[in-house]
Amino acid sequence: MTTETLVSGTTPVSDNANLKQHLTTPTQEGQTLRDSVEKALHNYFAHLEGQPVTDVYNMVLCEVEAPLLETVMNHVKGNQTKASELLGLNRGTLRKKLKQYDLL
């Protein structure tokens, strides 16, 4: 599948088994993206040393969302319209998130 097909919206990523497979295929280190996140969270909780923690969801979301946005923007050579279509986000929402992570 080409990027143009993705950007045109003809085949949502969630419906494409080949694209989803790239996210669940182990890396050279043998870990999927899911495995990496799980390992990082286990490591995070193991090193809290009794400190109270809140807002883990937002912490994880920020850690994943920032590199996702940066990588997509690099892939589309800074074209926000293409990036918003590729991500399935409203262009205004994309701009807000890019500003949030100092990527704009």
Curated annotation (Swiss-Prot):
One of its GO terms (biological process) is regulation of DNA-templated transcription. Keywords: DNA-binding. SUPFAM superfamilies: Homeodomain-like. Gene3D superfamilies: Homeodomain-like. GO terms for molecular function: sequence-specific DNA binding. Residues 80-99 bind DNA. Belongs to the transcriptional regulatory Fis family. This is Putative Fis-like DNA-binding protein.
